[in-house]
Amino acid sequence: MFLRQFSTSPALLKGKVLPELKNAQEISQFLRKSTWNVHDLIPSKEHITNEVDSRVVRKMLRLSGLDENLPEPELNRWAEMLNTHVAFINHVSDLHSSTKGEIGSSVFRLLASDHKPESPLTLKELLRQVDEISDHVSDQRGERGFDTSELRTRINRAKSTAEKE
């Protein structure tokens, strides 16, 4: 009653049939032999755009909490490496996309709005959040059955200390 149909297309199924690997040494040799290199996918220098400059490198270092006061040659070297990364991302994105372009660059954004710091958490705000925690308890997250009596004692001590200050 049921009709099954299976069809294949040589255009869609591409593969390579290799000889049978008979022992661990053959498997090890096969796995050691590389078939491609990531450097083959890195575009040549003329295809690399200069989206990243020393200003962007300084900003990335500052946002990462690293020392941004590097000598200019070092900043230029970082910018060159990051431009190579962006070009690589674009190249890999283009390999798997029907539309060519700088799709990868949209992922590589350095907008100030992406890095707005949250307002600092004060002790009073933290204590307020702890008081409201019972309103947000979830069975799905396994938050029932936790004994908060010890926790409440410590919180009340901290609260009284904060009020004295």
Curated annotation (Swiss-Prot):
Enzyme class of the recorded protein, top EC level: ligase
HAMAP family for this protein: GatF
Any one GO molecular-function label of the UniProt entry: ATP binding
Highest taxon of source: Eukaryota
Additional remarks: This protein may be expected to contain an N-terminal transit peptide but none has been predicted.
Name by which UniProt lists this protein: Glutamyl-tRNA(Gln) amidotransferase subunit F, mitochondrial
EC number, as in UniProt: 6.3.5.-
Record's GO cellular component terms: glutamyl-tRNA(Gln) amidotransferase complex; mitochondrial inner membrane
Region listing for Disordered, in residue ranges: 137-165
Principal cellular location given in the protein's record: mitochondrion
Catalysed reactions, semicolon-separated: L-glutamyl-tRNA(Gln) + L-glutamine + ATP + H2O = L-glutaminyl-tRNA(Gln) + L-glutamate + ADP + phosphate + H(+)
Subcellular location: Mitochondrion inner membrane
Keyword terms: ATP-binding, Ligase, Membrane, Mitochondrion, Mitochondrion inner membrane, Nucleotide-binding, Protein biosynthesis
Membrane topology classification: Peripheral membrane protein
Record bears the keyword Protein biosynthesis: yes
GO biological process, one term: mitochondrial translation
